[in-house]
Amino acid sequence: MPANMTDEELLAAHVAGDPNAFSELVFRHRDRLWAVALRTIGDSGEAEDALQDALISAFRRADQFRGDSQVTTWLHRIVVNACLDRIRRNKSRPTSPLPEFDSAELALPPGDDVIEQRETQLIVAQALAELPDDQRAAVLLVDIEGYPIEEAARILDCPAGTVKSRCSRGRSKLAKRLEHLRNPNIDEPDQEPEGGHGAQ
């Protein structure tokens, strides 16, 4: 496949029957899609399955791409939805720290050593996991992946105001949950009981 083909051209070529176009599209974006899946679910096995589900769905539904957003936005939407579906179905919980994610991203104090930083990552990952699904997806896309509100809204298929609200609520919960990391004199809070997932 020509390297200078745009994502839109590759997707159109796939729909037209080119057997290599979709593979090239996946090759371009798989690392980013994988990072989103892993950060959303937290478990590498579940993330791999969710990403596979998403790519199969994108492969089969390519003819439904309307062109009202970028192909990458469309792909991310499918991946996020696949992850949220799997979370709701399996009630997955993170068992490992998020990749390429450190305490600085939430303005946390750096650890004195690798072990302390790893423990901090585990705590942050668990705090993210305790957010309702929709709030976690919004926080991950906007605050960790760096998407603008408007693009995150397109990925999540909801109004920009809803994304802002979910981010605000999610940040507030994270700040409360992680306050003990900023202030060592504060005890770590008890984990909230499960059952709030999916709330807006």
Predicted segments, located by residue:
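A short, charge-rich alpha-helical start-of-domain segment used by transcription regulators
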Residues: 12-35
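Sigma70-family region 2
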Residues: 15-16, 39-44, 53-70, 89-92
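Conserved RNAP core-binding helix
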Residues: 10, 34, 44-61, 145-147
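Helix-turn-helix DNA-binding module
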Residues: 45, 126-137, 141, 145-162, ...
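Short amphipathic alpha-helical boundary/capping segments
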Residues: 9-13, 123-132
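Structural recognition of an alpha-helix C-terminal capping motif at a helix-to-coil junction
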Residues: 35, 49-56, 69-81
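Arg/Lys-rich amphipathic alpha helix in sigma70-family domain 2
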Residues: 60-67, 77-98, 109, 116-117, ...
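Internal acidic/polar
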Residues: 3-7, 93-120, 187-198
